[in-house]
Structures are given as structure tokens and as C-alpha cells.
């Protein structure tokens, strides 16, 4: 994308949204729930509305120095905020606003791409796409700025796809009178390859996964297929229900018709809520899956502990409400509704084991995915394993554990 085209697209998309409602103010709560949130805000010492995913973003290819640069510009902004205590709630689309600053960084990477060729240019465009995606984080349904940022993320990704030496094809799978859009990444096209279906969480897009393919799967001649969770990104038409794996199951059942992949060698990787969907799919389609990795996946504990759900930061509650399509949120009622999402309550983690080996992994002290959840998954999987990443070596531990998990998956697939 030339600098002028990129600038024009950004200006066209955002010109109507100079005074767009700020993200943290979008979700409406019932009076009793609003009181719970207000009381909690006074007790807690949170400086940000959003959960800052520094480790994940760095692993996905963002420079920590650039990341801190953006965060410091947001933090030091003198513009008015929706919540004075939360640094990332600057109102209006201008300097200091979360979306504005991340879009600005994304456009900087697009500019760099113009001066480069081939793989170097592609890498800059994929990084730009990641910046645009973070600009829309946590991707609430009625967030106009986030929706515009998503348009830029998809455009930059498509342009990166044209420049890279690898082949990226958009696959369309018919489902409930619509089409599921997935991106198939191929290291080569002269033979059928093993394939890994990857799903991110409820607050990120499938276009965030480029580095996973480039650094891990491509060197081993493994294809990667990305699918958005229901209610997010390309899958935003479908509401999220306890049948969290419905879209991925539909895509899995179409793999035999894709000539580039070996549908007898299919692996799964799920991050956060995507892990819930992938574990579920490993029980439903045991004959079609060779191995599964779930990273930080909530499968039981969180859903059956209403008090834990009620104590979640506002961003997570806003995001869940958005995914469930709620316009006015009653926290207690929503916590009760989530009980049905437990894979144990659904009967998967309570009787028979799945043949699929599952590696369940999470950070030590993770409130969303406690070690007990991972142990439960490992217990009901043949050759399943549960692993905990020590928080003492969190930066190193995060990367090493992800590398270890992907290597384990490759070994299972290539047996």
C-alpha cells in the first residue's frame, strides 16, 4: 500500500469518527452491576482499562521498544479521559487515543514496507496488520473505531500476502447461509502438507498469527489455517454460544476438499478461548485430529465460579457481554449463564478420554486458566500433558513454553 493510499484510507475511514464513543464507555450495565464496578474501581489500583498483552504482542512480532513508545504516548496524553484513572481511555480520535496511536505505528510500518522488497516488505506489512489489530483491541462489537481498524488490518495482511514468498489463500466454507472465512498459509504447493488449525482468543484476530507460521510451521513444511472465533473478526456474524467449536468443526469437515493439505494430518492450536474450542473439538472429532495444544484456555474453573467471573476486570466483562450480544449487562446473571460453557458441565471432561493427545499450558497463577483446568484436560486425553509456565522467568518462560508446545505438536503431526 503506498503511503498516500494508506493515509487516504485511514483518513476516509476515521473522518466520521473523530468523536466516536470511547471503548470503555460502550457497554451498558444494570444499576446494581454498575455499582459493583464502581466500588471495585475505587478499591483497585489499575492504571489501564485494557489488559496489556506485552508478552503476546512481542511474541507475535512487535518490537518491545515500539510498544512502550506507543504506551508512553497514550499515558502522557493531556486530553480528557472517560476514566481519569485509566490511561487508555482518551476520548476522541486524536493523539493519546488508543486506536489513534496504534494506527499511527501501523502506518509507520507501511511506510517502511514501501522502501523494501520481498520478504522484508511483507514482514513490515504483517507487523502493520498486527498494529492495526491492536488498535481495535479488545474488538467490541459496537466500537466504530475498532471496526475501521479491522479494515486496515485485513488490507495490510492481504498486501503482505502478495509480497511474501509463501502462499496465502483465503478459504470460504459455507455455514448457516453464510461463509466462514479462513486464511490458509502454505510453505509450498507442490505436495500435500500436514496442517494446523489455529484459533486466537475472543479479543484478537486471525491475522495476528503470522509469526507463528513464519517462525514455527513454515520451516517444518506444515501449513497453517486460521479461523476467527464466533462473534470476532470475519466470524462476527455468528454469536458465541457454549458450542464454541461450531465454526472450526465446519472448517475441519471441509479440509478433505482442499488439495494443498493432508486431511489425515491435522493439528489444533488454541489461544485463550480458542483453546476451549479446540479442546472441545478434540472430543467431537477424534478420528480427524492428530494432536492439540491449548494455551491459557478456560475450560471449567472460571465458568463454574461465579465469584471469579464477577471479579474479572471490566475489559473482560465488556468483551464477554459483546460476544454474547448483550445490550445491558447484569453481571450476576451473565456469570450464571457462563456455567454452560464448562467442558466438564457439557460432559466432555467427565467420562471418556479422547484419543487425541492434548498439551494444556498456562502461566503460573493465571486466573482464567488455572493449573487444575490443564490437569483436567490432560486427565481426559490419551497421552495428554499439563504444563505450567513459571512466573519467575515469565518473559523467557513464555517464549520457551510456546516454542516447546509448537515443537511437541510438530512431533505428533510428523510421526
Swiss-Prot record:
Q: Which Gene3D superfamilies match?
A: alpha/beta hydrolase
Q: Which reaction does it catalyse?
A: a carboxylic ester + H2O = an alcohol + a carboxylate + H(+)
**Molecular function GO terms recorded:** carboxylesterase activity
* Domain of life, per lineage: Bacteria
Which class of enzymes does this protein belong to? hydrolase
Keyword Hydrolase among record annotations: yes
Can you list the disulfide-bonded cysteine pairs? none
- The EC number(s) given in the record are 3.1.1.1
Q: Which SUPFAM superfamilies does the UniProt entry name for this protein?
A: alpha/beta-Hydrolases
Entry keyword set = Hydrolase, Serine esterase
Instruction: Report the function annotation for this chain.
Output: Catalyzes the hydrolysis of esters.
What's this protein's family per the entry?
Belongs to the FrsA family.
Q: What is this protein called?
A: Esterase FrsA
Q: Which organism is it from?
A: Vibrio parahaemolyticus serotype O3:K6 (strain RIMD 2210633)
Amino acid at each position: 500500500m503506498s503511503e498516500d493510499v494508506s493515509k487516504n484510507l485511514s483518513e476516509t475511514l476515521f473522518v466520521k469518527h473523530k468523536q466516536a464513543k470511547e471503548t470503555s464507555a460502550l457497554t451498558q450495565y444494570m444499576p446494581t452491576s454498575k455499582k459493583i464496578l464502581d466500588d471495585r474501581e475505587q478499591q483497585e489500583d489499575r492504571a489501564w482499562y485494557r489488559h496489556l498483552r506485552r508478552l503476546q504482542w512481542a511474541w507475535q512480532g512487535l518490537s518491545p521498544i515500539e510498544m512502550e513508545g506507543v504506551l508512553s504516548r497514550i499515558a502522557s496524553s493531556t486530553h480528557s479521559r472517560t476514566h481519569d484513572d485509566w490511561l487508555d481511555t482518551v476520548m476522541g480520535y486524536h493523539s493519546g487515543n488508543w486506536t489513534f496511536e496504534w494506527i499511527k505505528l501501523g502506518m509507520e510500518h507501511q511506510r517502511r514496507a514501501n522502501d523494501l522488497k520481498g520478504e522484508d516488505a511483507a514482514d513490515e506489512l504483517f507487523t502493520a496488520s498486527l498494529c492495526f489489530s491492536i488498535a481495535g483491541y479488545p474488538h467490541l462489537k459496537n466500537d466504530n473505531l475498532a471496526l475501521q481498524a479491522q479494515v486496515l488490518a485485513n488490507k495490510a495482511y492481504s498486501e503482505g500476502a502478495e509480497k511474501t514468498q509463501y502462499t496465502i489463500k483465503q478459504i470460504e466454507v459455507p455455514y448457516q447461509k453464510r461463509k466462514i472465512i479462513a486464511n490458509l498459509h502454505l510453505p509450498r504447493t507442490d505436495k500435500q502438507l500436514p496442517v494446523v488449525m489455529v484459533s486466537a482468543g475472543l479479543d484478537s484476530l486471525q491475522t495476528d498469527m503470522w509469526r507463528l507460521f513464519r517462525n514455527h510451521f513454515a520451516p517444518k513444511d506444515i501449513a497453517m489455517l486460521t479461523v476467527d472465533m464466533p462473534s470476532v473478526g470475519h466470524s462476527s456474524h455468528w454469536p458465541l454460544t457454549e458450542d464454541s467449536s461450531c465454526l472450526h468443526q465446519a472448517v475441519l469437515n471441509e479440509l478433505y476438499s482442499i488439495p494443498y493439505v493432508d486431511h489425515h494430518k491435522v493439528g489444533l492450536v488454541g489461544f485463550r478461548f480458542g483453546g476451549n474450542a479446540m479442546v472441545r473439538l478434540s472430543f467431537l472429532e477424534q478420528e480427524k485430529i492428530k494432536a492439540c495444544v491449548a494455551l491459557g484456555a478456560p475450560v471449567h474453573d472460571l465458568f463454574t465460579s461465579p465469584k471469579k467471573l464477577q471479579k474479572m476486570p471490566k475489559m473482560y466483562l465488556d468483551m464477554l457481554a459483546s460476544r454474547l450480544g448483550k445490550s445491558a449487562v447484569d453481571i450476576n446473571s451473565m456469570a450464571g449463564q457462563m456455567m454452560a460453557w464448562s467442558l466438564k458441565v457439557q460432559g466432555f471432561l467427565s467420562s471418556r478420554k479422547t484419543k487425541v493427545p492434548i498439551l494444556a499450558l498456562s502461566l503460573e497463577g493465571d486466573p482464567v486458566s488455572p493449573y487444575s483446568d490443564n490437569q483436567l484436560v490432560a486427565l481426559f486425553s490419551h497421552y495428554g500433558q499439563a504444563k505450567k509456565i513459571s512466573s519467575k522467568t515469565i518473559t523467557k518462560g513464555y517464549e520457551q513454553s510456546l516454542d516447546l508446545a509448537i515443537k511437541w505438536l510438530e512431533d505428533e503431526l510428523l510421526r
